[in-house]
């Protein structure tokens, strides 16, 4: 069992900061934090520090923000820290082999899926999008590939029928630190298990284009899209020249209309706006008009019933 490890942490967003927080509160010593350079954000496009940088500074942990780890200077800088292990969580920079080999126990990565499934940038969203029954976190020994390293441990989590990417993100942000601390406690005693590359799937980044609803898809797929694309980029369709975001929806289990076309509204009442899809009906429960807050269907219809009259075909 390992205790009091000297750890270099590398991460950027809030998901990573949750793991850093757990390490700070543990028996281990975080001797440095690596994170992405400050980026312009907000309407004023002022430089904004990452969640990891903000947390590290609050605890007087030295922060390093190299644009790349490929330079000899950056590599010597890391070597001088003499870390036992480097923990990487949603960092965003490629780690060259020399970096992977620098710490005594190498570099560990916490990934938000059950590897080798959903390697890549959007594992949480893709698990919902694909209709997976479960997901989890994997702690792996990093190698030069993209999420291809040998698995040290994993924790599993059921995906509920109402989980969105936002809710699943929160659950995994709690599960990940637990798995990380358990793995660190046994570091050196664990036997890394090679991933089966034949079972690998890739979690491609989401795009705004993908969020545009294609009514020829099945209702089941579109309902999953609504949950997978929440909180970003948010599934939407167009009506009356406006992009209307769908914030919640359900699948109609029994047919409402036999001859409706995909995209055609076949129900518009206080319960839902029902839209025919390529297979089944999508019952839209919550909508969001441009610049407005999400509202229940009934409230939307009170002010815009002409936009959603039965028979209208949405684009």
Swiss-Prot record:
Keyword line: Protein biosynthesis, Transferase
Cellular component aspect of the GO annotation: cytosol
A GO molecular function held by the record: methionyl-tRNA formyltransferase activity
Catalytic activity: L-methionyl-tRNA(fMet) + (6R)-10-formyltetrahydrofolate = N-formyl-L-methionyl-tRNA(fMet) + (6S)-5,6,7,8-tetrahydrofolate + H(+)
Claim: Repeat is one of the keywords in the record: no
Record flagged with keyword Transferase: yes
Pfam families for the chain: Formyl_trans_C (PF02911), Formyl_trans_N (PF00551)
Gene3D superfamilies linked: Formyl transferase, C-terminal domain, Formyl transferase, N-terminal domain
Binding site for (6S)-5,6,7,8-tetrahydrofolate: 113-116
Enzyme Commission numbers on file: 2.1.2.9
PROSITE patterns: GART
Database matches in PANTHER family: METHIONYL-TRNA FORMYLTRANSFERASE, METHIONYL-TRNA FORMYLTRANSFERASE, MITOCHONDRIAL
Family affiliation: Belongs to the Fmt family.
Function: Attaches a formyl group to the free amino group of methionyl-tRNA(fMet). The formyl group appears to play a dual role in the initiator identity of N-formylmethionyl-tRNA by promoting its recognition by IF2 and preventing the misappropriation of this tRNA by the elongation apparatus.
Protein's name in the database: Methionyl-tRNA formyltransferase
Organism: Pseudoalteromonas atlantica (strain T6c / ATCC BAA-1087)
Lineage of origin: Bacteria, Pseudomonadati, Pseudomonadota, Gammaproteobacteria, Alteromonadales
Recorded name of the encoding gene: fmt
